[in-house]
Regions:
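Soluble non-transmembrane domains of integral membrane proteins
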Residues: 80-339
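Helix-loop-helix
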Residues: 1-40, 92, 195, 208-231, ...
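Juxtamembrane extramembrane loops of integral membrane proteins
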Residues: 10, 26-119, 173
Length: 508
């Protein structure tokens, strides 16, 4: 029993040391968190990107606009437009046409709940919405208020067999008709957002599109049911371009004007555990930005300014992804968006392990058994190194009498004894450190596998057998850690004991 306790203490110390290193990196590797101050009131005007370059706004644009100082009160939830698809339950606010609620129907909020996981929402507990609009000299979204769209219906539902669902919103002002259309595709999370601007006036129309995510400083709701021993994962902004696919931008860096990048194929978003929301421009170059207003954080892009002549029209398009971090789907949206599944420094190994794990799952259909098979395959792949270790240990045992004789002969002269020992090792072609080789090879592989298990949304609420009904959560009864400790003790007893009495005592 004492031996088992020693093994478990060693394992606990190693795990604790690793967790402390990760916690130190999260707490001290970057600047301290931004000091939060209460908001006096929530305003619509503060949500609109300014083109004046004022403090707290996005960088100055090529077309200036006077946003004014007036603010308005957001529309009430009773006027929201409901949208139901095979993937989403959404609500759109006619004031601005923003998505203010998005529930993912294929993901439960908790393991024992039938309620869907809510990614976007706008209430007293959390503010996290996807906004877009038109700004500039003739823009319909200003600090004075958002455009109030009209809709042909209060609710839209994707029927069985229907491949796409369009939700058109219209707004008219001074001879200009703006049609903002959300297009949903069956079986997919990306949402197409288009602005068709028809200028029937006698004057040219000037403006630009913006798309952004607005989030407050509330915690990640996906981490609330993981327990006190769960590993904290990244919550913050991120962006990428084809030349620089994945970059993190913590909330406490949003107000530093660090994000000033233009791209026509990039993306910008907010990342949390298992889920991500991101905007990407489709047919124009977007100027990425981030900013902070009180407790609210904004990250998004502005389009280049456009000029629409009288009696002409133009369409601006963007794509919103709001869903799980499924790598195969993220790849189709934008380059580098799949890297929001963040495996850390060991990502090359992790990607290979996940590809193998995913392939095994397609055959077995159970993620738990797939993990076991993957672990066995990893052990088999390291068998050559283990055999080298066993061979070295056997050679060391055969050399034990000669080494003991050296110790008696040169016991007082450690330098001479070391030289003679190295000579024997060289003569017999033995590496005394070869016994550590399997451990050195296994550590990066199993650490990479650990991050695969932590980051893969496929394991969220995935059952295995018996009491293990969520592979993303720790064992509630700690049975698996106990079994691991027992197996390590048995494996230790099966290994040959060192011939040196002191080494044998240490290994007991």
């Amino acid at each position: 029993m004492q031996k088992i306790l020693r093994v478990m203490i060693i394992i606990a110390m190693l795990i604790t040391a690793y967790l402390l290193i990760l916690a130190w990196r999260d707490d001290y590797a970057d600047a301290p968190a931004v000091e939060t101050t209460p908001n006096a009131a929530t305003t619509v005007g503060g949500d609109i990107p300014s083109t004046t370059g004022a403090a707290g706004d996005i960088p100055a644009q090529t077309i200036p606009v006077d946003n004014g100082l007036a603010t308005t009160t957001p529309a009430q939830d009773t006027n929201l437009i409901s949208v139901t698809t095979d993937r989403y339950d959404l609500k759109i606010n006619p004031e601005g046409g923003d998505i203010v609620y998005a529930a993912l129907k294929q993901y439960d909020a908790t393991l024992d709940s039938d309620e869907p996981f809510v990614l976007l929402e706008n209430n007293s507990n959390r503010v996290y919405v996807a906004q877009s609009g038109l700004i500039g000299p003739n823009g319909i979204d200003t600090a004075d208020g958002r455009a109030s769209y009209r809709s042909a219906a209060d609710s839209y539902t994707m029927k069985e067999g229907q491949q796409t669902l369009s939700v058109p919103l219209t707004y008219q002002q001074d001879g200009v008709t703006v049609t903002k259309t959300y297009t949903f595709t069956h079986g997919k999370y990306p949402i197409d957002v288009s602005y068709q601007i028809q200028n029937r006036s006698e004057q040219p129309w000037q403006g630009q599109m913006f798309a952004q995510l607005k989030r407050d400083d509330s915690k990640d709701p996906g981490m609330s049911d993981k327990g006190a021993l769960s590993m904290a994962t990244y919550l913050g902004g991120a962006w990428g371009t084809p030349d620089d696919p994945y970059n993190k931008l913590k909330f406490n860096k949003f107000s530093n004007d660090e994000l000033n990048v233009a791209s026509d194929e990039g993306w910008v978003g907010i990342v949390q555990h298992y889920f991500v929301s991101a905007w990407t421009p489709d047919n124009f170059t977007g100027q990425f930005f981030s900013r902070e207003t009180g407790n609210d954080y904004f990250i998004g892009f502005n389009s280049q300014p456009v000029n629409i002549a009288a009696n002409k029209q133009l369409t601006l398009d963007a794509t919103l992804y709001a869903g799980p971090k499924v790598q195969s789907e993220l790849k189709e949206v934008a380059v580098g968006l799949n890297q929001t599944v963040d495996y850390g420094l060991l990502w090359p190994i992790s990607k290979i392990l996940f590809a193998i794990l995913d392939g095994i799952h397609k055959v077995l259909g159970n993620w738990g058994w797939s993990i076991i098979v993957l672990t066995i395959l990893v052990k088999i792949s390291l068998m050559w190194f283990s055999n080298k270790s066993y061979y070295s240990m056997a050679k060391m045992r055969s050399l034990a009498p000669r080494l003991a004789a050296l110790k008696e002969e040169h016991g007082d002269d450690r330098m001479k004894m070391s030289q003679e020992m190295m000579s024997i090792y060289k003569e017999e072609k033995v590496n005394p450190m070869a016994g550590c080789l399997p451990i050195l090879m296994q550590m990066p592989i199993f650490l990479a596998l650990y991050w695969v298990l932590v980051e893969s949304v496929e394991l969220r609420h995935a059952p295995w057998i018996l009491w293990i009904q969520d592979l993303s959560a720790m064992d509630p009864w700690f049975i698996l850690p106990l079994l691991m400790g027992v197996s390590m003790y048995i494996q230790q007893q099966l290994n040959p004991q060192p011939t040196d009495p002191m080494q044998a005592k240490v290994m007991k």
